[in-house]
């Protein structure tokens, strides 16, 4: 038996302006080479653009987008007797949000456009409406999980 204590679970700190954990998750995922102030600039500009486009609270649009992209189920490769099967597994809320943030950023990087703030704002607005590349990725993941339901007993 281990003599070490259990590590306490760390919670993400909220960002300084909106005081929101989701914004901070986005900032930490968009961060490159330790330039956090640049990451904050990009996110805040994107939220400002969302405010101008939709005339709604940008945090509400962000929450809607992440809720729309968050997957309930995913597939995990599992090796059984020499062959690899895609086994569907349920995803917890934290992991689902992390996947949603990652998919939103990947989809916004793929978009054509001037700068990252513009592309991110467009992707977030589209995801909140129920369209866009990130939503397509979620639906694709759900389809794969549905197709491999026969292997659900291999969990």
Swiss-Prot record:
- Protein's cellular compartments: Plastid
- Quote any Pfam family the record assigns: Ribosomal_S7
Record bears the keyword Glycoprotein:
no
The UniProt record lists the keyword Ribosomal protein: yes
- Record's keyword terms, sorted: Plastid, Ribonucleoprotein, Ribosomal protein, RNA-binding, rRNA-binding
- Give the GO biological process terms: translation
Cellular component terms, GO, for this chain's entry?
A: plastid; small ribosomal subunit
- Stored InterPro entries: Ribosomal_uS7 (IPR000235), Ribosomal_uS7_bac/org-type (IPR005717), Ribosomal_uS7_CS (IPR020606), Ribosomal_uS7_dom (IPR023798), Ribosomal_uS7_dom_sf (IPR036823)
Query: Which molecular function terms from Gene Ontology are attached?
Result: rRNA binding; structural constituent of ribosome
Report the PROSITE patterns cross-referenced here.
RIBOSOMAL_S7
Query: What family is it from?
Result: Belongs to the universal ribosomal protein uS7 family.
Q: What does the subunit comment say?
A: Part of the 30S ribosomal subunit.
| Function as written in the Swiss-Prot or TrEMBL entry | One of the primary rRNA binding proteins, it binds directly to 16S rRNA where it nucleates assembly of the head domain of the 30S subunit.
HAMAP family annotated for this entry? Answer: Ribosomal_uS7_B
Name listed for the protein in its UniProt record: Small ribosomal subunit protein uS7cz/uS7cy
Q: Which organism is it from?
A: Epifagus virginiana (Beechdrops)
| Gene this chain is encoded by | rps7-A
């Amino acid at each position: 038996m281990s003599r070490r204590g259990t590590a306490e679970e760390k919670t993400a700190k909220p960002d300084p302006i909106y005081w929101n954990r989701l914004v901070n998750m986005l900032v930490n995922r968009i961060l490159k080479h330790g330039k956090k102030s640049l990451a904050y600039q990009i996110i805040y500009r994107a939220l400002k653009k969302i405010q101008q486009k939709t005339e709604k609270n940008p945090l509400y649009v962000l929450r809607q987008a992440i809720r729309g992209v968050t997957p309930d189920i995913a597939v995990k490769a599992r090796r059984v007797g020499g062959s690899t099967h895609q086994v569907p597994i349920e995803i917890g809320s934290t992991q689902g949000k992390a996947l949603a943030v990652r998919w939103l950023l990947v989809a916004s990087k793929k978009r054509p456009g001037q700068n990252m703030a513009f592309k991110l704002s467009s992707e977030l607005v589209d995801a909140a409406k129920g369209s866009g590349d990130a939503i397509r990725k979620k639906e694709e993941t759900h389809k794969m999980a549905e197709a491999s339901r026969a292997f659900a007993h291999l969990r």
